[in-house]
Amino acid sequence: MLYQSSGLPTLYLQTASGSEKKIHDSKKNEETGTMLLVDAEGNTLHMGALSRIRIRGNSTTLFAKKAYQIKLDAKADLLGMGKAKTWVLLANVIDGTLPRNTLALNLTRAAGLPFISPCRAVDVYLNGEYKGNYLLCEKVQIGKERIAIHDLEEETELLNGQDLPAYGLVYGTAAQLGTPEESVNVTSRVKSLSKLPDWLKMKPGVWSARDIPLDPTDISGGYLLEVALKNNISTPARFTCDSGWKLVVREPGNASQAQVLSIFGIFQRIDTAIAQGDRDTLSGLIDMDSWVGKYVFEALLANFNAGASSQYFYKASGDDPICCGPVWDYDNILGISEVLSLQDTPTAHVHYPYDLFLRVTQLEPFMEQARTMYRDVHRPLALSLLGEGEEDTGLRSIAEEAAAISASRDMNFLRGRHYHESRLTEIGDS
């Protein structure tokens, strides 16, 4: 017997063991399994094997309601979102109203930001037990139907003839922080992540990479990077700029020394240009439209983690600039969190001293473009969310999004309220 709430598709997941204990114990653990996806009327949309199911996230792993990442045996188009193997189920555990992530992703897509993940609300059952309302969406990754830039890791792996994780790691410092790719002091080589020294967590001008012997001729792209908020070392390829700005190279996730130092050099020059207020140098290194658009979006939605957590960048190839995006993980927005003990800033909710947007907003040309973009692009979209817009933007209002998941939301909270009550603000409250 299959159970459903009204109005939403339902995803039924089954682990091979029939238990969730192994995967819930650690996000390093995974299982195989099966999945069944049905529409709101109970018609089968997809049925097949899972080569992987595991929990995902950082702080969300501490909650009873877990977020999941699943990998299908073969690419499939789920709910009209395009073919892919890897999919993410966001738990929206901080959001006591549930649609914040949906609103954010739809808003940025309407604003024209590139590579925004499509998303659909679904009910999820695991091993026959109802887990709640989730947001099914694509993983942030390089791919033809995802972030459509060159797959440098695939090319590197083909060149070396073996899986890149089989290689050890190399780490070191940049002797001249302004040009790390030109002057490098390699400290040592180790066989595993656990052997990397603790000082890599803290010092500026440090980096780590896979100790890979061969590099493609062109290593100018593509790269996908994420700001690393916490001082942990859980990924092979990473670096820290002068200001303490930490970045993880998500793709190629097993980047070589040459690859890490190449992209490190670009980000260090960006870091220096921002610190020195050198807008001419900065404009030659970054895609200003994407950076400004991302900032306006963060400020409009009052993102508590603006610029410091779940913040992505990508670089295509050649002389292409560093683009800001795609957007990801927006359940901590629109009044959920407050930091009352800190001074207000141009980004309102920023509270990290090395935060990207806190520093870049000191450049007046950046803010001039931000004001223009808000007036011409974002304000009409914001009015649509409030149900007050005169333009047909194609966006559903907050009230419409909430109504669409109302039955599922009621079911979700029958399992308990997973968020912090002290941090909850209903969407639309002042």
Question: What are the functions of these language-model segments?
Answer:
Residues 1-52, 403-430:
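Regulatory N- and C-terminal appendages and interdomain linkers associated
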Residues 21, 63, 248-308, 314-430:
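Middle-to-C-terminal accessory/interaction subdomains
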Residues 23-26, 81-83, 100-101, 134-136, ...:
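Short, solvent-exposed loop/turn and secondary-structure capping segments
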Residues 31-91, 252-262:
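Conserved oxyanion/phosphate-binding beta-strand-loop segments in alpha/beta enzyme cores
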Residues 67-71, 86-91, 98, 123-125, ...:
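Structural recognition of the beta-strand scaffold that forms the well-ordered cores
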Residues 76-77, 91, 113-117, 130-296:
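Internal "kinase-insert"/substrate-recognition segments embedded within catalytic cores
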Residues 93-114:
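A conserved alpha-helical element in kinase catalytic cores
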Residues 111-123, 303:
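Short, well-structured beta-strand/strand-turn elements
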